[in-house]
């Protein structure tokens, strides 16, 4: 039974891989939803790569799921949150976005489609801008994934998150896509008991 469950689980991972055109199934992580996916990234990336005074760039149209985790990190580590403004048409001001980058910018996290305005943000262009500054990019695809083709390799997204229920999947399931080279650099988000029980005096592996 456990083997069958594992096979079904990995088959689901392959389905998601094909759906978003990830390079491999090891780049697909299952979570409890978009919110947990973002919290995972903020926690792991923030702990590993961000110090007091470092900066994250988000947009003015983010869902609270992509605001509050960064605010908590700011309270805990003293990072700065920079916000991309928009015009009267509900479009992000890309010239202002470019100006927000500094040597302290560590990551950008922006929604692909606004859940309030319906604005489709040019995330492929925005990712290219971030990469030109050597900065990784998180795409919140919770609202875009049901309505448009999302190809992580075409976007060149470093991370991308969404929830299964948005595409008629089960509730309580989410996806975190991450490029393998980034996932390999992130520390564990949570721990668990594996096949052996390490002594509290020993380090975890």
Regions found by a protein language model. Name each.
Residues 203-205:
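N-terminal low-complexity segments that are often proline-rich with Ser/Thr-Pro
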């Amino acid at each position: 039974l456990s083997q069958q469950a594992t096979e079904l689980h990995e088959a689901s991972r392959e389905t998601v891989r094909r759906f978003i055109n990830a390079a491999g199934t090891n780049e697909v992580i299952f979570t409890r939803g978009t919110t947990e996916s973002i919290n995972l990234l903020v926690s792991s990336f923030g702990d590993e790569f961000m110090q007091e005074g470092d900066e994250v760039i988000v947009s003015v149209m983010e869902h609270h799921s992509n605001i509050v985790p960064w605010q908590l990190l700011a309270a805990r580590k003293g990072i700065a949150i920079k916000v991309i403004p928009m015009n009267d048409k509900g479009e992000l001001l890309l010239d202002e976005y470019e100006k927000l980058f500094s040597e302290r910018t560590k990551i950008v996290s922006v929604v692909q489609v606004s859940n309030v305005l319906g604005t489709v943000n040019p995330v492929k262009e925005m990712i290219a801008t971030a990469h030109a500054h050597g900065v990784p990019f998180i795409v919140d695809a919770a609202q875009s994934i049901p309505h448009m083709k999302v190809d992580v390799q075409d976007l060149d997204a470093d991370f991308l998150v969404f929830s299964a229920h948005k595409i008629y999947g089960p509730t309580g399931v989410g996806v975190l896509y991450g490029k393998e080279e980034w996932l390999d650099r992130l520390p564990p988000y949570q721990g668990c008991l594996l096949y052996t029980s390490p002594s509290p005096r020993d380090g975890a592996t």
